[in-house]
A protein has these predicted regions:
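Short, ordered, surface-exposed loop/turn motifs in non-cytosolic proteins
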Residues: 23-25, 32-47, 66
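Short, acidic Ser/Thr/Gly-rich low-complexity loop/linker segments typical of extracellular
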Residues: 48-59
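Structured extracytoplasmic
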Residues: 101-102, 106, 110-274, 280-288, ...
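Exposed, low-structure sequence patches enriched in small/polar residues
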Residues: 382-829
Length: 829
């Protein structure tokens, strides 16, 4: 019940990325003369390689598991100061540096090239030698620890009732170096994995040996989020992808367009001369970082990096973000990652003054047993998934195992989080709160054995049924992890008819989707709806309806089997039998004017879906695609079986589609979908390609906003849907608008299709079986609509204005809409 919510929060970190306890220190460095903040001051733990320079407010934050007792601040022209620390806890240490005077001889200053540029050129030139992602092969072992903490804890949290239920959790309160505020741990996870990468063949594969997450019993599902592979932060890339936001890297080939660079120091660390380079963003119209990199002078390799997200960047829900990376020469002297750390504070408000409760997420990855250039084991090459959970129950490991695999011991507080979270889950108040949250996210109110819902279909209304009431449910994984049974009943006050449906899902494999689904329903449907359309019984489809829905009663039974052969290759096979009934909104008339009560269809179908390096989150019965940088291809073929049902038709239908999301930083990204198909044979209009209209004010990316239902049909067609999201590149330059952080979108959609004479029911003397509904025609002249949208309004809403560019003339039986305003809701970083 609460597990999906915890896994969802863990996924936010995954999407990015002793008994010695952690020593954390945060503070500000100022000038003793005037009290102003000092920028570029070097702050280090003496005797270690952990250090950073202060930002424009003079702020610094450091964290280490090394045993340290002092922190030191130094800057040319100021006296160095060293102050004591209390190890193993949070320290707030401010420095006030005193300027020193020293005499120098005559200095002649001449203009010249920034001394950083030759160093950066060397880094770019040597990326093939120093970037692990460009090596032929490598393998390593990873240990990943993620923690989710609650901060800005209000006094109400310490009320008498909460103290009675949760008082013991306040023993775990600590202070964050990221924000300087107290936090309460809410979740901790650990995983250990073997990571393999190859250039030929190109793949990156993670074999998770063990994983555990506090408070989650389904460790197989959780393990997919707790690994380290997909959270990589690679400063050698031109753009660093964190939470689906592409930040310009300071080591980007075109980094000078985004950053100003300063050579602030050179030093010797572990016998190697290191250049310390500070970088600041030139502008905040695109996602950028602020921080420093340390470059090895001999190899031009990145030795370490520390960066943060500056204030004012157009990013949602993240108040603070810190990235830390450390590299060392490893196998054969090649450079490799030693440690990565991502820390982020998630909040509804991004203002520092906000007192709203927020979450701090931290993800640390330690790398060991690095092997570069060695052959990948055959067993790994044969694996059919890029994330492989070795054990069906990866969380069933004793504490002794974790003590052996950790590169450092957890603090006593960290060890206690597991027991603390398990204790919290037995508190009734907690169970009630998480049941409510889980219901909002999943759509079902889960009892132990039955989930009741979806709640958004409990009540709705439409022209055909009037007021509709629906009650449904499905079994939970407590009943079975291999079989799920669901069903619903519904009743409409206008048609006074009982409807319903049911389904049985049988999952044969968790690692790869191999699932049989049986469904049956007697219910109303909107033929010709888009793939992302609000379902007919959704309350939002009723509220946002334009009033031109044209529903049909359908009896349908279907069986579908999906077989995923390997990661990225799936086939489908199934059979369908259905009967579609006429009504006053969707009449059925023969060419001689004789009405028809219904049409029948029986068909078998097969399909193929191909993707590459697609990230997929797998649950017992469902899976969620998290996207791919490569196009996704789908193919389908259907064959109608004549007389399998009384009056069913013989036909053949071939369809294909491709979806692609090219990233085009810094000017955003595009979403491109192209679909096409051909129907061979004579069929009634219900079995033609009914092009996707939109009967609501809700935006559907795979439907035409200005097109009505039953306006166009084809038996051969090609359609396209294109959006480009600029992520605020243009609006972010306007003085007043940029503070709103709105983001602009361009939209263009179109379809072209033809109808054979035997299927064209819109012409006089037609050979078709049925006449078309009034106003429905072929789209032999392409239909095109285009417009623009503004998203990120209040960080949630999007408004699109769409114009119909063709087929603008009135039609008999159709109210043509040449302009549409659509609303939608998007939760994006």
């Amino acid at each position: 019940m609460a597990q999906r919510t915890l896994i969802f929060l863990a996924g936010l970190l995954w999407a990015a990325g002793a008994s010695a306890q952690t020593t954390r220190v945060r503070g500000q460095v100022t000038d003793t003369a005037d009290g102003k903040p000092l920028q570029f001051v070097s702050v280090v733990f003496p005797g270690t390689t952990t250090g950073i320079t202060t930002d424009e407010q003079g702020i610094y934050a450091l964290e280490t598991r090394d045993t340290v007792s002092r922190v030191q601040a130094s800057m040319v022209g100021y006296a160095t100061r060293t102050l004591p620390l209390t190890p193993g806890t949070f320290n707030h240490v401010d420095f006030a540096l005193e300027a020193v005077e020293f005499g120098i001889g005559q200095v002649v200053i001449t203009p010249g090239e920034n001394p950083v540029y030759p160093i950066l050129d060397g880094v770019i030139r040597n990326k093939p030698l120093n970037d692990p992602e460009r090596y032929d092969t490598y393998s390593c072992r990873t240990y990943t620890k993620m923690e989710l903490d609650l901060t800005n804890i209000r006094p109400q949290f310490r009320s008498r009732r909460l103290q009675r239920n949760f008082g013991f959790v306040f023993d775990y309160v600590d202070t964050s170096a990221l924000t300087g505020q107290a936090y309460l741990p809410a979740m901790i996870s650990e995983s250990t994995a073997d990571l393999y990468r190859s250039s030929r063949p190109a793949f990156k594969r993670e074999v998770i040996r063990a994983s555990r997450i506090s408070g989650v019993e389904d460790n197989f599902a959780a393990a997919q989020f707790t690994g380290g592979m997909h959270g990589d932060v690679n400063f050698y890339d031109n753009f660093i992808d964190i939470f689906n936001v592409r930040f310009a890297s300071p080591l980007s080939d075109g980094g000078r367009a985004f950053y100003n660079y300063f050579l602030v120091d050179s030093m010797v660390t572990e016998g190697r001369k290191i250049y310390k380079i500070r970088f600041h963003p030139k502008r905040l119209t695109t996602p950028v970082l602020d921080g420093e990199v340390n470059i090895d002078s001999a190899s031009y390799a990145l030795q370490s990096a520390s960066a943060r997200m500056p204030k004012g960047v157009n990013v949602n829900w993240i108040r603070h973000l810190m990235l830390d990376n450390e590299n060392r020469p490893a196998d054969k002297g090649r450079w490799f990652r030693v440690h990565d750390r991502v820390s982020a504070e998630f909040s509804v408000s991004t203002a520092d003054s906000s007192k709203l409760t927020s979450f701090i997420g931290t993800r640390e990855v330690a790398y060991s047993d690095v092997r570069i250039g060695e052959p990948i084991p055959d067993e790994v090459l044969r694996m059919d998934n890029n994330v492989v959970v070795r054990d069906e129950e990866p969380g069933h490991r004793r504490e002794e195992f974790w003590e052996q695999v950790r590169p450092y011991s957890l603090s006593e507080k960290e060890k206690g989080i597991y027991a603390m979270v398990d204790s919290v889950q037995h508190v009734p108040l907690y169970r009630n709160i998480y049941t409510l949250i889980n219901t909002v996210i999943v759509g079902y109110w889960n009892t132990k054995y039955i989930g009741i819902g979806p709640y958004y279909k409990l009540a709705s209304f439409n022209k055909l049924e009037g007021f509709r009431m629906q009650l449904g449910g499905r079994t939970t994984t407590e009943v079975s992890r291999t079989v799920r049974v669901g069903g619903y009943v519904a009743y409409g006050t206008r048609d006074e008819e009982v409807k319903g449906g049911g389904s049985v899902e049988v999952a044969f494999n968790r690692h790869l989707t191999r699932k049989l689904t049986l469904t049956a329903r007697h219910d109303v449907m909107q033929l010709g709806a888009g793939q992302n359309a609000l379902t007919e019984s959704n309350i939002l489809s009723s509220i946002l309806s334009r009033g031109d829905q044209r529903l049909s009663m359908v009896n349908r039974g279907e069986a579908v089997y999906e077989h995923e052969w390997c990661h990225g290759v799936s086939t489908f096979a199934g059979a369908r039998m259905q009967r579609i009934f006429a009504n006053r909104y969707v009449p059925m008339l023969r060419p001689d004017g004789v009405p028809v009560n219904s049409v029948s269809d029986a068909a078998v179908h097969v399909g193929l879906r191909l993707s590459k390096n697609e990230t997929v989150y797998r649950m017992p019965f469902d899976k969620q695609s998290m996207g791919s940088v490569y196009p996704i291809l789908t193919l389908g073929f259907s064959a109608g079986i004549p007389d399998a049902l009384h009056g069913s038709y013989e036909y053949y239908r071939l369809e294909g589609g491709i979806r692609y999301r090219p990233e085009l930083p810094p000017v955003g990204y595009s979403d491109i979908t192209v679909q096409g198909g051909r129907i061979f044979g004579k069929v009634p209009y219900q079995l033609l390609k009914l092009h996707e209209g939109n009967g609501t004010y809700f935006y559907d990316p795979y439907a035409f906003s200005c097109m009505n239902f039953y306006e166009f049909a084809s038996d051969a067609w090609v359609s396209w849907f294109w959006e480009h999201h600029f992520n605020g590149v243009l609006l972010g330059r306007l003085p007043l608008i940029k503070k709103l952080k709105w983001r602009e979108v361009l939209v263009c959609k179109g379809v072209w299709g033809t109808l054979s004479r035997e299927n064209n029911g819109s012409t006089a003397g037609t050979q078709a079986d049925l006449l078309f509904p009034a106003g429905m025609t072929s789209v032999s002249d392409p239909y095109v609509e285009a417009g623009f949208g503004v998203e990120n309004i209040f960080r949630l809403f999007r408004v699109d204005c769409i114009w119909r560019l063709t087929h603008r003339s009135p039609k008999p039986g159709q109210e043509i809409q040449n302009f549409a305003v659509n609303l939608s809701l998007h939760l994006k970083f």
